[in-house]
């Protein structure tokens, strides 16, 4: 996947919160990741910074994939809710749906993507 330089969708990625979605031992999960970084246009590379004990990292280690939905302005409440709770104790997808937020299945990986986000990115871990 390439990220086009100067493209309007690529520009939205510069400062917005990444809503990272995963599936693994903690089930389908979402978290707000303020440290979501665009690394390269071609190939399209993204880095996220996670705490070693978080459920999101455990899911990614198992599945080797994750989604990033770059939050739109209207999703600030969602960012706050999913960023301040752990999937180890709260079903954040269920809470988000109860708040009226909707999800779609990713096209190439087994995660949900947040509907109406500024940008969707389906990621696979490589190393």
Predicted regions and their residues:
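Active-site-proximal mixed secondary-structure blocks
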Residues: 1-127
